[in-house]
A protein has these predicted regions:
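Conserved NTP-donor binding/palm subdomain of two-metal-ion nucleotidyltransferases/polymerases, i.e.
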Residues: 2-132, 138-370
Length: 370
């Protein structure tokens, strides 16, 4: 198949798999340019708050807050307000750790940019969401100094190439993910840092200061993260959050510089990943991006190959990783029983990650995806 045909086929699969029918319906009307009482009533008529996933309830609570003119039934209004209150209190402990770390880094001094959900908390303080940790980025030359300072404060690191993920003490409770670059799996990730820091603005966070990315960088990071979520088969909640964030930033387009987003994608080698993520968003929000944003990428054979790679990672690699569970081999030998099936899955993953393009397509065909 040609590039565009493959792209369309994969987008159809993703649209049906990633979000449930109820979630697609909710996004389509909740993020529409205008929301009517009739569309809300029609949705609520077949909606059961007891059966609905948490992210959908949160999106409805946002809708209630942004559209005070809409009338919600008495049976659901207290629950929707309660979700916002729950998220606000859930974040208190996390942000207490964040502000303590921010103050420490500012005293060194080490500049840091807050990313993703932490940044949205600053952009939209009245719209809390559940967060497991807060992502921050520092200059590469400051990374080890920042990591040592945070570790000296009693936080325990899980060390990766692009970040150290700090938990609270010896617990598994997340606190801060310290990045030297934002992972994109292109080998060019660090090229984003200079512009990201230069365009960010300083904001006060309790007893410390941090840098907040500009709107354009937030949109770029959201699209890259969406691509990762699609290929990694993460929960629909992360995808819903991306739609909410993009609607917030793209609904306020005055002075929005699309060239920054394009330049970020070019520098980091993520043009196709960003275009695919934008194309996925456009299946539900058709007017989110300007007509020329995707350019000719979607018609290229390269885009088709990237779509099949996304599908391979999502349907073949990610489920096997989830089945393996424990990634640290030494820890696995101490804790996993029986060990032989675990070893077999690790060997299988090793070879599946190293197959060529034709073999990957053949595996997808055998599974019925293409």
């Amino acid at each position: 198949m040609e590039g565009r045909a493959v792209v369309n086929q994969v987008l159809t699969i993703l649209t049906q798999e990633v979000l449930a029918a109820e979630e697609r319906q909710l996004l389509s009307f909740a993020l529409a340019p205008s929301v009517s009482q009739e569309s809300l009533d029609a949705f609520l008529e077949g909606w059961d708050i007891e059966e609905s996933p948490f992210p959908s309830i949160l999106l409805l609570s946002y809708l209630m807050k942004t559209h005070p003119d809409l009338s919600f039934p008495d049976s659901v209004m207290p629950r929707l307000k309660g979700v916002l209150t729950y998220c606000r209190f859930q974040n208190l402990k996390l942000f207490a750790h964040f502000t303590k770390i921010a103050a420490k880094l500012a005293s060194l001094p080490i500049a840091m940019v807050v990313l993703k959900g932490g940044a949205m908390k600053i952009y939209r303080p009245d719209f809390p969401r559940w967060m497991g940790d807060i992502d921050i980025l520092v200059h590469e030359q400051d990374f080890h100094r920042a990591a040592e300072a945070i570790e000296a404060m009693g936080y325990s690191p899980l060390k990766c190439a692009h970040s150290w993920d700090f938990s609270i003490g010896e617990t598994q409770e997340g606190a801060i993910d310290l990045h030297r670059y934002f992972q994109m799996n292109t080998g060019k990730e660090s090229s984003l840092n200079e512009g990201l820091f230069a365009r960010a603005r300083e904001v006060n966070v309790a007893s410390g200061k941090c840098l907040l990315p500009c709107r354009e960088d937030m949109v770029f990071i959201s699209l890259v993260n969406l691509y990762k979520n699609l290929s990694g088969k993460t929960s629909s909640g992360s995808v819903l959050n991306t739609f909410i964030d993009l609607d917030y930033f793209l609904g306020r387009r005055d002075g929005f510089d699309w060239d920054i987003v394009r330049d970020n994608a070019r520098k980091t080698g993520t043009e196709i990943q960003v275009s695919l993520a934008a194309a996925f968003v456009s299946t539900l929000l058709p007017h989110a991006f300007p007509e020329d944003f995707l350019g000719g990428w979607m018609d290229s054979d390269l885009a088709g190959r990237q779509c099949l790679e996304l599908l391979y990672q999502r349907e073949i690699i990610s489920p096997l990783r989830a089945e393996i569970g424990v990634t640290n081999v030494i820890k696995a030998f101490k804790t996993v029983r029986p060990i032989l099936p675990y070893i077999g899955r690790r060997i299988r993953l090793f070879f599946l990650k190293r197959t060529g393009y034709r073999t990957r397509v053949a595996i997808l065909k055998k599974k019925g995806y293409v």
